[in-house]
């Protein structure tokens, strides 16, 4: 009998070690996995391990609910909410350990940028601010936002925030003296406004779109010129009006700005 065959036969008689099961809790606890499967739960901080970053498919992820980029979708009407429901609660976007002053920005639908600032305290206190909408598409603006990182003030701020949008968005910053004066002036001239009540019901997105339309209105030279906002909705530049108030789906600017009407 060849020596190699004899050795193989003897080896087959030896007891084999028990098969290692990747589903056994003791194995998963001793061998942290990088696969986002059920086995990952054993190394998650919720299981008693030290809180901190843990790997999922080779990407460092903080514990807790993750902040996801909202994919803009064309709404059926501009009165759709400015941000999805999952972005309405600040704790839902908390990322690991943060210090007061940390800011997280999130692109919402139609190119709006929602900024959350952590104010400290047990449980976390957040303030949020909506900026925009921005000119350009989501794909064009996203790289700029990613390169800006977390800052106190976003470098994407292109001009002042929409009038009235801050309070409508719920950041609670209140009115400044200038805004209060504008509001009083609008109320005083309210009865004199003869603008048609055309467009969707008022809402945060509508106000933002109206603000965007006012900027475009300043550029529109020909009466009746139509422009399309970042959300894909058509606005028509019309007559010049002295009133300055936001109405259903349109805004009348100063005498220097054309009237803007939501078309489709």
Swiss-Prot record:
Highest taxon in the source lineage: Eukaryota
Biased composition (Basic residues): 188-197
Biased composition (Polar residues): 144-154
Biased amino acid composition, Low complexity: 29-40
Region of interest: Disordered: 1-52, 123-207
Protein name per Swiss-Prot or TrEMBL: Putative uncharacterized protein encoded by LINC00482
Source organism (scientific name): Homo sapiens (Human)
Gene giving rise to this polypeptide: LINC00482
